[in-house]
Amino acid sequence: MDWSTQRVVILGGARQGTALARYLVAQGAQVTLSDLKAAHQLDLQLLAGLPVRFVLGEHPLSLLDECDLLCLSGGVPTDLPIVQEARRRGIPLSNDAGLFLDACPAPVIGITGSAGKTTTTTLVGEMLKADNPGRAVWVGGNIGNPLISDLDRIQPGDRVVMELSSFQLELMNRSPHIACITNITPNHLDRHGTLEAYIAAKRRILDFQSPDDWRVLSADNSVTAALGGEGASTLWFSTRGRPAEDGAWVDEAGNLRVRLSRASSPELQAAEGAVICH
């Protein structure tokens, strides 16, 4: 994308919003950052000296009059009047995670779930580093620093492990090459409103995969057990016995077992092993 022609409004001045602002300014975009807090309540030092316009203390609808893309930080609700008005006007919505996936040159393992996603993300990263000490492995997303801050340093031969929350996923229109859902149980219903909406947000990590991609899913969770099938290839994991299809499980003696009917990558093996061990 030629960002030099784009006017981007970012809602939320926390770490995701400021990281995204720095990235977009570097790409040549015209950036406005808006936050409901006052300047003294925010840490905006990372944006000092950059050509960013600030609108603080409110999110006026007039921000949309000169807006080609509206980006939300992770904690910004999607039911705000300005977000609803952007949808009415047909202004695209995105966030730092979505723009990162759009531009990342390296394969990405994306991990989400109601529980265990941070541990699994960290473990997958460590396993990949141990497998090939000479290869750069980037771990981030909903943990650590926003990965978009590192985008200019990531090379095609690197590997990326990305934790993704439901807040990030609900605005994304791209799936990672390997997508893992540890489990789905009722959570964040104050944000999503219904369990069905929460499940739909989590499912978006899978929705844009191609037949060349992979999904790693729990056979023990009633929600994720229904998410295999069409699209990407599926690997299952279970602590209750051997899955009917390819995957990993813990046998009666407590040993980790893996069955794969086709060749897989170290990245896929790491994701499969980590989710069952977390």
Named regions from a protein language model:
Residues 13, 35-36, 114, 142, ...:
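Cofactor-binding loop segments of dinucleotide-utilizing enzymes, especially the Rossmann-like FAD-
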Residues 1-95, 99:
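N-terminal leader/targeting and accessory segments in enzymes
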Residues 6, 11-14, 74, 192-199, ...:
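Adenine nucleotide phosphate-binding catalytic loops in nucleotide-utilizing enzymes
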Residues 16, 34, 73, 114, ...:
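Short linear Ser/Thr-Pro motifs
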Residues 7, 12, 52, 108-111, ...:
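Short, flexible coil/turn micro-motifs enriched in small/turn-prone residues
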Residues 1-2, 38, 42, 95, ...:
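Short, solvent-exposed coil/turn linker segments
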Residues 32-36, 55-58, 94-98, 138-140, ...:
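Beta-strand->loop->alpha-helix junctions that form or flank phosphate-binding loops
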Residues 25, 62-65, 74-233:
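Phosphate-binding loop of NTP-binding sites
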